[in-house]
Structure formats: structure tokens, C-alpha cells
A protein has these predicted regions:
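N-terminal redox-cofactor-binding region of secreted/periplasmic oxidoreductases
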Residues: 1-550
Length: 550
């Protein structure tokens, strides 16, 4: 074993959506030495930065973890593909760039019902605004001058236009911004793009910090365990280029690996449920039964149609001229088809079971999508993705073995709650209604999925069991909570319970799913954590009240 004796003030494990934010914010103080460790490579693949390139990213093993779930008992034992970003920027480098914060009630629920005191909407809004450069200008809900550029799309398909126009026919309103008080309706998504290019946290944050002498960024370095001494985190053991090395932290180790990797690393380090650790032959450093529990994710199903007009984004000979033009448009103006995130439009609606605002989200794609884009889907078409926003099903992340290279066992337990089934069934029915609006008359071909034969609840549920997939929003496996909640892994300052000098800062700390895409909230969490850490370092009291200057 080779020991790297360099000591840093802070070691951040994971250079993704949260880690890139933390590394940038903490290294603003030139007196602090910060080490950022990323298991993946640098974000040099050009398809990362071209928004339309996301349709191909899932085929590149080098920038994704390639995870699969355990067999899903309510889905015919299917082992679902679970893509997560493995590159600088993490999943913010491979996602669809939709900028969604969720509902006010989501954060108020965290604070008032789930033990996350100080994380109400009023508390977290300043950190959303701090991170943001909203191209339409600052106001009550949006900020400017932040590293994360948020813009309108530079290109939308006529099929997306038809979807948004279907709102009034179906009894919904058209909305210009889903990040305000009223968000029930349909519209176009704001996206994390700058000048027609993806604005990941690597691009928005790390780019401005990478030349700082006090920030070291190492890629292709796999963390194996947190080093502990007398109840304190003192460093990280890693494997780089086949060699095991150790890096040491003077102040804190901060895990930013996400809802799969962070609980796995905690357990490999001896922090987690005692029985599971002992079964895997791992010495128990801290018995925390909540590590790896409370896994939640948004399940997604596509109502898919063929298109009888040559519109949208097709794999077809007839589409070649449009792609030739698109190449020129993008190369010279950063506009046109290649600036599209494909999931251009969508919306939020309520099922009959909704209690506090919309519980269904839509993403409209003017294309035929098959197996997360890993398989070519020929021909013209379009689809509406249906997502249950507040699933009752709960899953787990557990260890397959005590070997760091072995994938964790991912079991989201999809559709085990009957209410989730009902919400998804209603969502499919609403999606069909929207796609049958008069604006689609000149486009609608045949229904590919679920298929016209699927009409009863039982038949639609059968379709869900056979075809539903993740829409990439896992959270909750290191949840924050109050001191009297034995299942809470971190406190409201994101410190791991019972271990000094160790925090978790990523989507795994969310107590429950927010009503929408999870990347923007993850960035907010990292912004908030940076303030906690700075205050602790400076010996200042940490306030959980909202930031005054943000």
C-alpha cells in the first residue's frame, strides 16, 4: 500500500452535481486546501456539452456507472437499467437539463413533518437563487449572477408546441415558469444551458475554480473507504491506477457520491446497519440503521405514438437534411435542433389521489425512445413520459460484498404500494387525453405503448409492469432528520451521526422526494452545506435560518 501523506483541509468524494459545487465554494477561501476526488473522467466528451447529445450518452460506458437494479418483484423480476453520471459534473453532465425545484410544500414537509428543521421553502429559496443565473432576470423566485445558468430553450419542435397547446383543451393552463407558486399546467421547461450548451456543475462551477492553487481535482480515483480514528473521519482510502493510496483531511471528509455510492461507501467504512455489516465481515464503527434505507425514485412510463408527419427528431433517412442543417446551425450559432434537450415540454397535473398540489409530472419528447436511448428506434414519433411524483414505495441500497468494486444492491421496490399503481394508471389516462387533443390530429399515427388494447386498469397496470423504467431521481438513502429519529443518518447540518468530521452532501440526504427533477435541489443542498462548513471552520455559530445576503 502506498501512502499519500499530503493533508488537505477538506476532502470531497465525488465530483458530481453536489461535489463540484462544494469544491468551488470551499476553495473560495485561499487559506483552505481542498481535494476533490472523482471516480470518473474529465467531462471532455463533446456529447456532454451538446444538449442533443444526451440521446447518445447512455451508450458510452465510460461516463456512466452502468447500474442495474435487483429483480423487481412487482415488475416480473425485471432488472432495470439505472444510469448515473460518472464524470466531472456527475448526473448534471448527463441529464436532460430540466431546471425544476419542486413545490413549496415539499420543503415545508421536510421541515415540519420529517425532522429537517431549518429546511423549509423560505429557508432554502435563497440558496436556489444564489446558485442561479436566470437569464430572464432576478425577481422574488429567481437569482442572477450565480454559476448555474438557467435559460429558455433555443429550439423547440412543432410537436412540443402541439403538446403545450393541448393544455386548454384538456382543462389545464399554460405556464411560463414551473418554479413559482402555481405550477399545475403545461409548458416548456427551463434548462441548465448557457449559450446553447449544457451548463453542468462542472461547467458552471468548477470551470471558474480549476486554476485555484488551493484546489486539487483528481479524476479516475475510486474511493474504497473513509479512514476513521477514535470516532473521527481522518481521510479516504482510494484506488488509483491499480494502486491503493490514502489522503488525509485536517478538518472534514465530505461524501458527495449520490444516493447509491454514498451509503455504499459509508457501509464499506463500517458505518451502517450493524447486522448487515457483520454479515459482510465489516468491523462496525458506528451502528446507523438508516444507512441505505428509505430509497425513493420516480418511476416513469411512456405513452408512445408514431407520427404520420415528418416532424420531430427521428432516426430516418428523410430526417438527414434536417440534421445537416442542424449541424451548421449549432456550429455557427449554437441554435437549432442540437441545442434541444429533447425533453422540451412537460407539466404537472393532479390525480384523484393528490392531496397537496400536482402528483404527476410529464416530460414530452418529440421522438421515439427505446431503452433509455441505448437502442435505435427508427421512424417518426413522440411520447409523453408519465411520472408518479410522490411514491409510497420504499427501497434499499445494500452491500453485495465487502469489496469496493462490487456494485451495491439497488432495490427500489417499484409499484409495491397500491397507491403508486393507481397514480400511474391515472397518469397514463391523462397522457392519452392530452395526446388526443386537436393539435395532434395531423400528427397522430398509431399508439405503440401501451397500445389500444390496454384500456382497463388491469391492462394498463400490466403495461406498467412490463415497460416502466426509472426517470433517474433516486434519493433518501442517507436521510437527514432529528436527533430522536433512529433512521436519520445525518443531522440538519448534514453531519453523520456519531462520527466527527464527516458529512454527506448530495441527494441521499433528502428525507423524501420533491415534486420534480432532483438536480436543482441537489445543487441547493450543496450551496447550503458550503455555508455550514465555512461557518464551522471559522468557529461561527451555524444558523439554520434562511440566508440574509443570498
Amino acid at each position: 500500500m502506498s501512502e499519500v501523506l499530503s493533508k488537505y483541509d477538506y476532502i470531497i468524494v465525488g465530483g458530481g452535481s453536489a461535489g463540484a459545487v462544494l469544491a468551488t465554494r470551499l476553495s473560495e477561501n485561499p487559506a483552505l486546501d481542498v481535494l476533490l476526488l472523482e471516480a470518473g473522467s474529465k467531462d471532455t466528451n463533446p456529447l456532454i456539452h451538446i444538449p442533443f447529445g444526451l440521446s447518445l450518452l447512455s451508450r458510452f460506458e465510460g461516463i456512466g456507472w452502468g447500474y442495474h437494479t435487483a429483480p423487481q418483484k412487482e415488475m416480473y423480476d425485471r432488472e432495470l437499467f439505472w444510469p448515473r453520471g460518472k464524470t466531472l459534473g456527475g448526473s448534471s453532465s448527463v441529464n436532460a437539463m430540466c431546471y425544476i425545484r419542486g413545490q413549496k410544500e415539499d420543503y415545508d414537509r421536510w421541515a415540519n413533518e420529517e425532522g429537517a428543521e431549518g429546511w423549509s421553502f423560505d429557508d432554502v429559496l435563497p440558496y436556489f437563487k444564489r446558485s442561479e443565473n436566470f437569464e430572464e432576470g432576478a425577481d422574488e423566485y429567481h437569482g442572477t449572477g450565480g454559476p448555474l445558468n438557467v435559460s429558455k430553450l433555443r429550439h423547440t419542435s412543432v410537436l412540443s408546441d402541439a403538446f403545450v397547446n393541448s393544455a386548454s383543451i384538456a382543462g389545464y393552463q399554460q405556464l411560463d415558469d414551473f418554479n413559482r407558486d402555481d405550477r399545475e399546467g403545461l409548458g416548456y421547461y427551463h434548462v441548465t444551458q448557457a449559450n446553447g450548451q449544457r451548463c453542468s456543475t462542472a461547467k458552471g462551477y468548477l470551470t471558474q475554480a480549476k486554476h485555484r492553487n488551493n484546489l486539487t481535482v483528481l479524476t479516475r480515483v475510486a474511493a474504497e473507504k473513509v479512514l476513521l480514528k477514535e470516532g473521527r473521519a481522518i481521510g479516504v482510502q482510494v484506488r488509483e491506477k491499480g494502486v491503493v493510496n490514502r489522503y488525509f483531511a485536517k478538518s472534514e471528509v465530505i461524501l458527495c457520491g449520490g444516493a447509491i455510492n454514498s451509503p455504499q461507501l459509508l457501509m464499506l467504512s463500517g458505518i451502517g446497519p450493524r447486522a448487515e455489516l457483520e454479515e459482510k465481515g465489516i468491523f462496525v464503527q458506528q451502528d446507523l440503521p438508516g444507512v441505505g434505507q428509505n430509497l425513493q425514485d420516480h418511476l416513469d412510463a411512456i405513452v408512445q405514438y408514431t407520427c404520420k408527419a415528418r416532424e420531430g427528431y427521428a432516426v430516418a433517412l428523410g430526417a438527414l437534411p434536417s440534421y445537416v442543417k442542424a449541424t451548421a446551425d449549432y456550429a455557427f450559432r449554437r441554435k437549432g435542433i442540437f441545442s434541444s434537450n429533447i425533453a422540451e415540454a412537460g407539466g404537472f397535473v393532479s390525480s384523484s389521489l393528490a392531496t397537496q398540489g400536482p402528483d404527476i409530472q410529464f416530460h414530452f419528447l418529440p421522438a421515439i425512445l427505446n431503452d433509455h436511448g441505448r437502442q435505435l428506434a427508427f421512424g417518426y414519433g413522440y411520447g409523453l413520459h408519465v411520472c408518479c411524483l410522490y411514491p409510497k414505495s420504499r427501497g434499499t441500497i445494500s452491500l453485495q460484498s465487502n469489496h469496493p468494486a462490487d456494485q451495491a444492491l439497488i432495490d427500489p421496490n417499484y409499484l409495491t404500494a397500491e397507491e403508486d399503481q393507481q397514480v400511474m394508471i391515472e397518469g397514463v389516462r391523462i397522457a392519452r387525453k392530452l395526446l388526443s387533443a386537436p393539435d395532434f390530429d395531423k400528427f397522430q399515427g398509431s399508439e405503440l405503448y401501451p397500445g389500444v388494447e390496454a384500456q382497463t386498469d388491469e391492462e394498463i397496470l400490466e403495461f406498467l409492469r412490463e415497460r416502466a423504467e426509472t426517470i433517474y431521481h433516486p434519493i433518501g438513502t442517507c436521510k437527514m432528520g432529528s436527533n430522536d429519529d433512529e433512521m436519520a443518518v445525518v443531522d440538519t447540518q448534514l453531519r453523520v451521526r456519531g462520527i466527527a468530521g464527516l458529512r454527506v452532501v448530495d441527494a441521499s440526504v433528502m428525507p423524501s422526494l420533491i415534486g420534480g427533477n432532483t438536480n436543482a435541489p441537489t445543487v441547493m443542498i450543496a450551496e447550503r452545506a458550503a455555508e455550514f462548513i465555512k461557518a464551522t471552520h471559522e468557529g461561527q455559530p451555524v444558523s439554520l435560518a434562511k440566508a440574509e445576503s443570498a
